[in-house]
């Protein structure tokens, strides 16, 4: 499955520790590390929520219903998966402390921490602390050997499987089709393409829908919890085109499609870099670098071209406070040197950089850069009693971080 999203190799040569993460939420603990400018007044109430078996979007929806407000008034810095015990921050516009204190949601503990003058944004999140129990993994000797090798070569910062979907890893495929201006096929891949691992009954319905492309049948057969698929099919029944239907999706979901395709190309670039160089510590002409900023916890900040101050950049990489950065390609990306290999990957899909400027803003992207190396030295990593504890800067995936140790596929 990993190869389908561009994760094609390991950087370490050690044997895997093996093991698996069980389905119990307590085995996967994640806590946001964030910085806010709090005050005693402001239009935005800031809350800290400890929740179990709640994904972020569903929690925000249920919370808005409990408060009797629009979900648009609730903001957060990042999304968290359902199958975990999570601590996360939310801002709520125009709600008082007394109102939130009357809310009681199952498996969720809500604590008011203050007010702010603006909503929570992605930039407020520095990173996440993880505590993950792995069942059936081997002893700590392999752990130490792998850790040492990662310190020497770098720790690959792939986008994890969850970037591409929860059970059906098709988000990047939808993004590719949108960039190809093939909205009809993008619509049906999202709504109907069957995928191994999905609920058997639902998969069979999708198989029929994939063959027939019958919106009426889909509305009759697809379960109600697949609300986005059903909403799209309803738009077709109302006479809208596949393109118009896709544009009716929530903004954050629309943006995910092209972002997922960018992530797929990034993963392929990172895999190829590892294969060619065997290390993420080597810098070439035309490369970019990302720098750590040390706040409450370290987080990656600006990127720059290596040649702008080559001696300084090489020194910072050697001192482990800067990382090689690879492009998240977009219409403004300037590819130089080694990274021009991205053009070959795009060409395989009949795309180029200009393809990322579409007629719809939410399906366009100018591009950016992402650190290739997680810099394991700053994670505070420990391993005791089959439990990994570590911190990762925002945008880094715990399952990706662990894969070099376990050498097993983690979704």
Curated annotation (Swiss-Prot):
Gene3D superfamilies: 1.10.1510.30, 3.30.70.3160, TruD, catalytic domain. The keyword Ubl conjugation does not apply. The active site is at 81 (nucleophile). Pfam families: TruD. It comes from the Archaea. InterPro entries: PsdUridine_synth_cat_dom_sf (IPR020103), PsdUridine_synth_TruD (IPR001656), PsdUridine_synth_TruD_CS (IPR020119), PsdUridine_synth_TruD_insert (IPR011760), TruD_catalytic (IPR042214). Its EC number is 5.4.99.27. The keyword Isomerase applies. It is an enzyme of class 5 (isomerase). Keywords: Isomerase, tRNA processing. One of its GO terms (molecular function) is tRNA pseudouridine(13) synthase activity. NCBIfam families: tRNA_TruD_broad (TIGR00094). Could be responsible for synthesis of pseudouridine from uracil-13 in transfer RNAs. Belongs to the pseudouridine synthase TruD family. This is Probable tRNA pseudouridine synthase D. It comes from Archaeoglobus fulgidus (strain ATCC 49558 / DSM 4304 / JCM 9628 / NBRC 100126 / VC-16). The gene is truD.
């Amino acid at each position: 499955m990993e190869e389908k999203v561009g994760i094609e190799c390991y950087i370490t040569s050690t044997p895997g520790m093996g093991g698996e993460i069980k389905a119990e939420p307590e085995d996967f603990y994640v806590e946001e590390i964030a910085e806010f400018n709090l005050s005693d007044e402001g239009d935005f109430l800031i809350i800290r929520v400890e929740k179990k078996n709640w994904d972020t979007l569903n929690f925000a929806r249920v919370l808005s219903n409990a408060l009797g407000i629009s979900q648009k008034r609730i903001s957060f810095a990042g999304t968290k998966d359902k199958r975990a015990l999570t601590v996360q921050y939310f801002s709520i516009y125009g709600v008082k402390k007394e109102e939130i204190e009357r809310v009681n949601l199952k498996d969720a503990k809500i604590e008011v921490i203050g007010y702010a003058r603006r909503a929570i944004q992605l930039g407020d999140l520095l990173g996440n602390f993880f505590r993950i129990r792995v069942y059936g993994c081997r002893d700590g000797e392999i752990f130490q050997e792998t850790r040492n090798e990662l310190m020497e070569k770098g720790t690959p910062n792939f986008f994890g499987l969850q970037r591409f979907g929860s059970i059906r890893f098709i988000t990047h495929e939808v993004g590719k089709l949108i960039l190809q201006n093939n909205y009809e096929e993008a619509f049906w891949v999202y709504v109907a393409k069957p995928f191994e691992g999905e609920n058997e009954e639902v998969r069979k319905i999708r198989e029929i829908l994939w063959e027939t492309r019958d919106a009426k049948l889909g509305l009759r057969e697809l379960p109600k919890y697949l609300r986005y698929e059903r909403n799209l099919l309803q738009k077709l029944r109302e006479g809208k085109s596949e393109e118009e239907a896709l544009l009716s999706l929530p903004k954050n979901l629309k943006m995910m499609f092209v972002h997922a395709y960018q992530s797929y190309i990034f993963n392929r670039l990172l895999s190829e870099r590892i294969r060619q160089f065997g290390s993420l510590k080597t810098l070439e002409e035309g490369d970019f670098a990302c720098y750590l900023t040390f706040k409450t916890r370290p987080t990656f900040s600006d990127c720059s071209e290596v040649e702008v101050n080559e001696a300084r950049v090489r020194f910072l990489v050697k001192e482990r406070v800067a990382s090689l950065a690879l492009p998240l390609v977009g219409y403004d990306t300037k590819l130089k040197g080694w990274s021009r290999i991205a053009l070959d990957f795009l060409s395989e899909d009949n795309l180029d950089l200009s393809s990322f400027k579409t007629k719809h803003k939410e399906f366009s992207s100018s591009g950016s850069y992402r650190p290739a190396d997680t810099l394991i030295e700053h994670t505070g990593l420990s391993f005791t009693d089959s439990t990994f504890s570590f911190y990762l800067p925002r945008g880094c995936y715990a399952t990706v971080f662990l894969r070099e140790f376990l050498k097993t596929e983690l979704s």
